[in-house]
From Swiss-Prot:
This is Adipocyte plasma membrane-associated protein. The keyword Transmembrane helix applies. Residues 1-32 are annotated as: Disordered. Belongs to the strictosidine synthase family. It comes from Bos taurus.
Length: 412
């Protein structure tokens, strides 16, 4: 045995070196423990959020009780409906001087409209002048609307006066020059045993004798228009008021959100927009078909608001929400799913839901037989937003809105 061999035999055992491999089991164990903690925390958080949500879905009442509605596939946005930006060529008028000019009428070149703060105003020489108010203030929030009033449909009569329907107050005649207001029919007056909760639009015969108007619902008020649309309540009516006899007749009942109305040029029928059914109904008021009704046009490319005469002998129809095709229409999707609509309005306010509705404004011109003639678009609602009416006068379209702080004018 050599000395070296002896030294090798007597060499003490080397201390074990701690390496990464040696730590691996401990690290894996720590990782496993951390993973369990993360999963447990995640599950607790999910339960913390889910249980109240489920409780809300079970315990909270939905403000609506919708029925399933079925629509045809929307018309393709091709040809006459090909998207364009023509509405973006419009100019804004009276910006930040008024809000929500829903409907427009003219006497000569003087324009009139109703606003969200309950006023009827005259628009002349760049100035906004209040000529009537049917309610009383304050007029700042949706809760104020019933007391404040909300003028909607407005028409010029034959004697230099205006006929105005207020969603909450009733049917009025206004002398804009003398600022005189006459109540023709109070919304508090029950018609055939039912109240009028949401007066909307009107059209007047040339002699001023008959006024045809819509009551969108006997259940919902204007401030809850989105709930009415989502529920699709069939309690809307088309009515007739005789300015001489003061008699009121129900012409059509069981309408789902009737909105705009327009007499034909010959005054033999009245067109009434049925917003929740994306169609326009026709009721005959004279001639061989008197008392009869049919569908004038159905399966519109959007949800129609007001309807007004065009210089071509047809009609302008305004739409603040479209049924995109190709594309996706949330309102069409929800129409056949009442449970989803109930859940949405259990959890979210109308104002929150409105934020998810694309601001696509569409104005459609119809022929006298209901065929599509042309369409004007603002795909992003950049200029014309929440469009409610297209009123033609002297080669221009005056474009109303139920929310915008201005009026728009487009040269045709």
């Amino acid at each position: 045995m050599t000395e070296a061999d002896g030294l090798r035999q007597r060499r003490p055992l080397r201390p074990q070196v701690v390496t990464d491999d040696n730590r691996t089991p401990e690290a894996k164990g720590g990782s496993s423990f951390s993973g369990r903690v993360f999963r447990a925390t995640f599950l607790m958080l999910a339960a913390f959020l889910t249980i109240p949500l489920l409780g809300a879905l079970v315990l909270l009442d939905s403000p609506i009780d919708p029925e399933p509605l079925s629509f045809k596939e929307p018309p393709l946005f091709l040809g006459v409906l090909q998207p364009n930006t023509k509405l973006q060529q419009a100019e804004r008028l009276f910006e930040n001087q008024l809000v929500g000019p829903e409907s427009i009428a003219n006497i000569g070149d003087v324009m009139f409209t109703g606003t969200a703060d309950g006023r009827v105003v005259k628009l002349e020489n760049g100035e906004v002048e209040t000529i009537a108010r049917f309610g009383s203030g304050p007029c700042k929030t949706r809760d104020d609307e019933p007391a404040c009033g909300r003028p909607l449909g407005i028409r010029a009569g034959p004697n230099g006066t205006l006929f105005v329907v207020d969603a909450y107050k009733g049917l009025f005649e206004v002398n804009p020059w003398k600022r005189e207001v006459k109540l023709l029919l109070s919304s508090e007056t029950p018609i055939e045993g039912r109240k009028m909760s949401f007066l909307n639009d009107l059209t007047v015969t040339r002699d001023g004798r008959k006024i045809y108007f819509t009551d969108s619902s006997s259940k919902w008020q204007r401030r809850d228009y989105l709930l009415l649309l989502m529920e699709g309540t069939d309690d809307g009516r088309l009515l007739e008021y005789d300015t001489q006899t003061k008699e009121v007749k129900v012409l059509l009942d069981h309408l789902r959100f009737p909105n705009g109305v327009q007499l034909s040029p010959a005054e033999d029928f009245v067109l009434v927009v049925e917003l929740a059914m994306v169609r326009i109904r026709r009721f005959y008021v004279s001639g061989l078909m008197k008392g009869g009704a049919d569908v004038f046009v159905e399966n519109l490319p959007g949800f129609p608001d007001n309807i007004r005469a065009s210089s071509s002998g047809g009609y302008w129809v305004s739409m603040a929400a479209i049924r995109a095709n190709p594309g996706f229409s949330m309102l069409d999707f929800l129409s056949e799913r009442p449970f989803l609509k109930k859940v949405i309005f259990k959890l979210f306010s109308q104002e929150t839901v409105m934020k998810f509705v694309p601001r696509y404004s569409l104005v459609l011109e119809l022929s006298d037989s209901g065929t599509f003639l042309r369409s004007l678009h603002d795909p992003e609602g950049q200029v014309v937003t929440y469009v409610s009416e297209a009123h033609e006068h002297s080669g221009h379209l005056y474009l109303g809105s139920f929310r915008a702080p201005y009026l728009c004018r487009l040269r045709l």
